[in-house]
Amino acid sequence: MLLLQFHDHGPRVGRLELDGKVRLLRDCTSTYDLAVEVITKRRCLAEVVEERTDNAQFDYERLLIERRLLPPLQHPDSAHCFVTGTGLTHLGSADTRNSMHKKVSGDIESLTDSMKMFRLGLEGGKPKDAKPGVQPEWFYKGDGSILRGCGQPLVMPDFSQDGGEEPEIAGLYVIGPDGTPFRLGFALANEFSDHIMERQNYLWLAHSKLRQCAVGPALLVGALPDHVEGISRVRATDERVRWQKPFLSGEANMSHHIANLEYHHFKYALFRRPGDVHIHVFGTATLSFADGIRVEPGEVFEIEAAAFGKPLRNALAVEAPPHSAVVPL
């Protein structure tokens, strides 16, 4: 089941059908309000969607062309949405996997911090018992103000050295009144970052992640398939494919259980504040930057996986953010 948020004389929520039509959900203007209602009434999200599905239809292609799609989950107050993520969690392609195993097979003291973290995940990211596994790398991207929907530009501040894509899957969550995290489902995400800054010094990773993040276009309700295979592309301004590469996700291609990544995020009381929204990305092993690609303004990132329907498309833009010097009081 795939859900969409879009504009039509105000915000709307629709269910994507196999014929490409979007059927409106009655009495529903946001997936956030829908989730809060489902949590409060202790219902099943998929069942409520079935009950609310109306005969009113919209054309998905037209919504895409007219850029009327919104991120699939938002909080009405962007300060109450956390956008965060984990890295070094994916095994990647067979070549990447073999390469990684060779790099981490030596003496632990000779490994870089990144390879140590990857090795920890291989050894303890999927515990056999009910105990928590090893904690992953973790980072903060921003609040809800950085979220962008399909068709909206990803804006790189002019002080950045790079604006590159990271094709990922995100978990989408709302915190219940007793602090319980409830997962609505999953969505494609472009965890947009400055890879040159990160490469210059790994301690600048936190800086490099403070960028916008595209999510959508659709929310996949329910479980994530164990194996997700997609394509990440960079299109030139004339729509020519300049670079493309498959990417893999799902637990079969990860060194951590998703439940383990969720545990190590939500174990902090700060992230269990009732009513808050969390968009948490799970990592990737595929980057155009790793192949020497520098994306130029106006070029388009395109991330696609069959389980999520239409691709997530966002053009790169650059702007000078406003800056004011600090004034002492």
Regions found by a protein language model. Name each.
Residues 18-51:
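N-terminal cap/recognition module
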Residues 8-10, 187-189, 193-329:
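Catalytic-pocket segment enriched in acidic/His residues
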Residues 30, 59, 85, 151, ...:
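Helix N-terminus capping/helix-initiation residues
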Residues 4, 8, 40-236:
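Active-site microenvironments in enzyme catalytic cores
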Residues 27, 93, 306:
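Surface loops and adjacent helix of pleckstrin homology
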